[in-house]
Amino acid sequence: MSYRTYISTFKFVFIDECQDLNAAQRELMLCAAKGGRFVAVGDRKQAINGFCGADCLSFDKIAETPNTIELPLSVNYRCGSNIIKLVQEIVPQIKAYENSESGTIETYKVLSKSLFHNGDMVLCRKSAPLVGLCFKLLQNGITAIVKGGDIAESMLKLINRANCNSINDLSKWIDNEKKKTATEIAEYLNVGLDKAKKTKRYINLADKLDCIKNICVSQLTDVTELKDYIQKMFDEKSIKNAVVLSTAHKSKGLEADRVLILTPSNFPMITKYSKEWEVQQEYNLKYVAWTRAKKDLVFIDMSENELNNAELTEDNK
């Protein structure tokens, strides 16, 4: 940072979520606190943004700054004690507040209308299952939105790139695009198609394409109607009275009385190509997702294929 001398300094500098700072942000913080003090709040086990440039060791590097004192914040005041017991399998040192409610943990293997209530938060490791479920909820008269305008933007860009008029042609284009991408990766890495489909590049693109594929159904007449439907699904103006669906990454900092985890088997999402820091952050993400629930944590234990083929029943039986 060649402009260090131009950075204003302060007697006290406060920084939140310090585990997700990148190198430049951390240097800026230290420059601003030069001659003063800084208070950094964070959690090593909530470092989940390495994929977008955060320094995975940011918390430790701040803690190792000369004259820095590290204090624990191990008591969780949000989650019920039963939820914390489950979370301790991931982060053993976390403790429940002594006066916290017990909380409930439930598991379901079917989708039903009665399973979803206004104000619920539904979390998933990937975007495509969320989009598919949101479509089912809307079709059954349940107000629901997917959190994340960037997901809608990426879907619309792919649809425009496909340049198709009919839903059927778009669906075929998606299948061909996935095959084309897998082949390109396989040739580049000199591996088979199965291994190519386990790479981050393929998984990320396939997730975006599957977001579109999951709502390419007969009820929609053309691509223009599909685009309008996508805008509706991601309209956060109705968030107060809706079932809110979100990726685990976007749920960071949020909470709800009742949280449903969609396809929990995707936590952690690890392949043989995952680096050590990526593996750690996948477990961190699982910890973040499980601890969004204040009272009730519900697991919808269905595979992505089962979710795609499932219809919403009237009850949980």
Question: Language-model segments: which ranges?
Answer:
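Conserved helicase C-terminal RecA-like lobe
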Residues: 163-300
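Short, charged/polar "capping" segments at the starts of alpha-helices
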Residues: 305-310
